[in-house]
UniProtKB/Swiss-Prot annotation:
Binding positions (heme): 18
UniProt-listed HAMAP family: PSII_PsbF
Functional note: This b-type cytochrome is tightly associated with the reaction center of photosystem II (PSII). PSII is a light-driven water:plastoquinone oxidoreductase that uses light energy to abstract electrons from H(2)O, generating O(2) and a proton gradient subsequently used for ATP formation. It consists of a core antenna complex that captures photons, and an electron transfer chain that converts photonic excitation into a charge separation.
Protein name listed in UniProt: Cytochrome b559 subunit beta
Major subcellular location class: plastid
Gene Ontology MF annotations: electron transfer activity; heme binding; iron ion binding
Keyword Transport attached: yes
Membrane topology category: Single-pass membrane protein
Keywords: Chloroplast, Electron transport, Heme, Iron, Membrane, Metal-binding, Photosynthesis, Photosystem II, Plastid, Thylakoid, Transmembrane, Transmembrane helix, Transport
Highest taxon of source: Eukaryota
Annotated cofactor note: With its partner (PsbE) binds heme. PSII binds additional chlorophylls, carotenoids and specific lipids.
The protein's assembly and partners: Heterodimer of an alpha subunit and a beta subunit. PSII is composed of 1 copy each of membrane proteins PsbA, PsbB, PsbC, PsbD, PsbE, PsbF, PsbH, PsbI, PsbJ, PsbK, PsbL, PsbM, PsbT, PsbX, PsbY, PsbZ, Psb30/Ycf12, at least 3 peripheral proteins of the oxygen-evolving complex and a large number of cofactors. It forms dimeric complexes.
UniProt source species: Oryza sativa subsp. indica
Length: 39
């Protein structure tokens, strides 16, 4: 009842957090890997 109402908000928030976190982690990981490879 209250779960049915808060569930879509939680999923949208979860998608927004992961949508921003995944590219950020991948971007930082690629930058650090490039710096380690160059040196």
């Amino acid at each position: 009842m209250t779960i049915d109402r808060t569930y879509p908000i939680f999923t949208v928030r979860w998608l927004a957090v992961h949508g921003l976190a995944v590219p950020t982690v991948f971007f930082l990981g690629s930058i650090s890997a490039m710096q380690f490879i160059q040196r």
